[in-house]
């Protein structure tokens, strides 16, 4: 317990002391993050689940394990920095209580998906529906008291950036696991993508009704290129990825972009940005040298073929040249890869965000 308290104090110093410019006002008042292990900053540390990253070597370049599924920072950590905000504390952490919540809260939970059933074999996780409920609690019990009237709170929420990175687990921890889930027997690839988008649309409407207006929808990456999927097949195409899986994800992503367009015209006062993570990350895998990377088909910390048969274990020694790897473990990018993704999706010069960059969204 004592060591946990020490870690929490250290985390507070990091969150409050990093990421926010001292010379300039932030571009947005707050950054609220929803999603899965790609952006979880430690929520799963507080629940009974197998989906945890609270052990070394996770966090090796952060200073200590924080619960992030990475050697260092995630893409939303860098995203917060681009917005001029401190790193966003996890909802279940004591650090998200009080004035800290005014700069944003991270609700993301490893193994979570759009569908409530997704990831259930890991044990507890906060589904996307559950995360939205936590957002509602945040508004009512943690934020409302800081505003003199409801109009000020509505203005604050409307100016805040809402980041949504969800959907990957609905494939790798649901549809692509026929021994555990029936979705692949029930739905074709296209029908499943339709189901995900229909469900997601209703969830986004909940966020809108709670006051969210500026929302960033991150597309799923090329899941057919991650080490865990490569380790399970004997034949890959010339790009080094599993084409069938990438085609499934592309069905979801194309519909997600269409959803952003639709919501921009049907939800008054809202603005949606779609982040084309798939094409960016696929290019990083196929042309790593273009981004200063070297190894793009093997995990820095993993076991078996491509380091993807069994993910990074406690106290396992990771690769030493982590800044040359695209993948940290069997599923997740390295800090270096996350930094590249954030630059191309959050920064002023981002060229993988549609129809505008997150920087421009925040300035609206």
From Swiss-Prot:
GO molecular function: lipase activity
UniProt key word Secreted: yes
InterPro entries xrefs: GDSL, GDSL_esterase/lipase, SGNH_hydro_sf, SGNH_plant_lipase-like
EC number: 3.1.1.-
Glycan-modified residues: 236-237, 264, 351
Active site: 37 (nucleophile), 329, 332
Keywords, comma-separated and alphabetical: Glycoprotein, Hydrolase, Lipid degradation, Lipid metabolism, Secreted, Signal
Keyword Lipid metabolism: yes
Top-level taxon in the UniProt lineage: Eukaryota
Enzyme class: hydrolase
Signal peptide range: 1-19
Subcellular location: Secreted
Gene Ontology cellular component terms for the protein in this record: extracellular region
One Pfam family named in its UniProt record: Lipase_GDSL
Family: Belongs to the 'GDSL' lipolytic enzyme family.
Protein name: GDSL esterase/lipase 7
Gene: GLIP7
């Amino acid at each position: 317990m004592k060591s946990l308290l020490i870690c929490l104090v250290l985390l507070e110093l990091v969150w409050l002391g990093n990421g926010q410019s001292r010379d300039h006002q932030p571009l947005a008042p707050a950054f609220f993050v929803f999603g899965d292990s790609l952006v979880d900053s430690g929520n799963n540390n507080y629940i009974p689940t197998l989906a945890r990253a609270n052990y070394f070597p996770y966090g090796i370049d952060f200073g200590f394990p924080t619960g992030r599924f990475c050697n260092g920072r995630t893409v939303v950590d860098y995203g917060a920095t681009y917005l001029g905000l401190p790193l966003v504390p996890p909802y279940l952490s004591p650090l998200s209580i009080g004035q800290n919540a005014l700069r944003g809260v991270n609700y993301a939970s490893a193994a979570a998906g759009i569908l409530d059933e997704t990831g259930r074999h890991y044990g507890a996780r906060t589904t996307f529906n559950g995360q939205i409920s936590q957002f509602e609690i945040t508004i009512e019990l943690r934020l409302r008291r800081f505003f003199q009237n409801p109009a000020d709170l509505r203005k604050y929420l409307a100016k805040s950036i809402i980041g949504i990175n969800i959907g990957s687990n609905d494939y790798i921890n649901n549809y692509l696991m026929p021994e555990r889930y029936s979705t692949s027997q029930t739905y074709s690839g296209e029908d499943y993508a339709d189901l995900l988008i229909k469900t997601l649309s209703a969830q986004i409407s909940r966020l809108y009704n709670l006051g969210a207006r500026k929302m960033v929808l991150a597309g799923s990456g090329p899941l057919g290129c991650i080490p865990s999927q490569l380790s399970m097949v004997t034949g890959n195409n010339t790009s080094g990825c599993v084409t069938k899986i990438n085609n499934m994800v592309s069905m979801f992503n194309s519909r997600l972009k269409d959803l952003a367009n639709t919501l921009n015209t049907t939800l008054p006062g809202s603005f949606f940005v779609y982040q084309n993570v798939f094409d960016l990350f696929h290019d990083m895998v196929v042309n790593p040298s273009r981004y200063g990377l070297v190894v793009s088909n093997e995990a820095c910390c993993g076991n078996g073929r491509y380091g993807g048969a069994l993910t990074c274990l406690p106290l396992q020694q990771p690769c030493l040249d982590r800044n040359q790897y695209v993948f940290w473990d069997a599923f997740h990018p390295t800090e270096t890869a996350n930094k590249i993704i954030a630059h191309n999706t959050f920064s002023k010069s981002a060229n993988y965000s549609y129809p505008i960059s997150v920087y421009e969204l925040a300035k609206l």
